[in-house]
Amino acid sequence: MKDDVLKRQAHTAIQKKLGYAFRDMSLLRRALTHRSHHAKHNERFEFVGDSILNYTVARMLFDAFPKLTEGELSRLRASLVNEGVLAEMAAEMNVGDGLYLGAGELKSGGFRRPSILADAMEAMFAAVSFDADFNTAEKVVRHLFAERVRRADFQNQAKDGKTALQEALQARRFALPKYRIEEQIGHANDSMFVISCDLGELGFVCRAKGTSRKAAEQEAAKEALKWLEEKLPLKKKKK
């Protein structure tokens, strides 16, 4: 009973942060339900929410940076639409307080896990579109990302590890790296991935861990890039 009251309070606070009040609260509850808690979880909602998020931020950047190329816009969007940013946003909104998690996930601190928080954010964008329409969901995303887009600075924006490594290899005329899952530790809801990054003819292979495959690949790419730049630095062009 007490838990129900606390959940309702959390959901009220989350709606205020979203800037949207649900007519059908079951949609919000579904968006906040992890697969460890119930068969009717939020993963299908994530699929829709991810598309809404990517389109909206892409359009915001398109309008805000008219001189950037397609590749530059893509990299800037990747710096804004990722697990880290979404998890940070969810933490600011105290989304973890409103999550429905299975006993094991709850015990292991799932309400703080970045991947779970990020997924819940995407699922909520979908829930808004189902409760209202696409335009309303777009307004919610714009409301949440307005300040981040305003502060976005392409010139000082670090590229993600995989993109930076790819461009560094291409600049040196080497083949693209190959990533492979070497190990998956833990259960489905609490996995740790070990990924290898193989630079092929350069004879360098490194490994990195992450709570998701994407995160581990990024870490492995950063390690490989560090090695590449130390071993084969590019000569600076004379002015």
Swiss-Prot record:
- Catalytic EC class: hydrolase
Describe its function: Digests double-stranded RNA. Involved in the processing of primary rRNA transcript to yield the immediate precursors to the large and small rRNAs (23S and 16S). Processes some mRNAs, and tRNAs when they are encoded in the rRNA operon. Processes pre-crRNA and tracrRNA of type II CRISPR loci if present in the organism.
One Gene Ontology term of the molecular function aspect: double-stranded RNA binding
PANTHER family linked to this entry: RIBONUCLEASE 3 (PTHR11207:SF0), RIBONUCLEASE III (PTHR11207)
Q: Which cofactor does it need?
A: Mg(2+)
User: What is this protein's name?
Assistant: Ribonuclease 3
Q: Source species, please?
A: Neisseria gonorrhoeae (strain NCCP11945)
Annotated DRBM domain residues = 160-230
Q: Name one GO cellular component term.
A: cytoplasm
Protein's cellular compartments: Cytoplasm
Q: Which residues bind Mg(2+)?
A: 46, 119, 122
Q: List the keywords (alphabetical).
A: Cytoplasm, Endonuclease, Hydrolase, Magnesium, Metal-binding, mRNA processing, Nuclease, RNA-binding, rRNA processing, rRNA-binding, tRNA processing
- Quick check: keyword Magnesium in the entry? yes
Reaction catalyzed: Endonucleolytic cleavage to 5'-phosphomonoester
Query: Which positions fall inside the RNase III domain?
Result: 11-133
Q: How does it assemble?
A: Homodimer.
- Which family is annotated? Belongs to the ribonuclease III family.
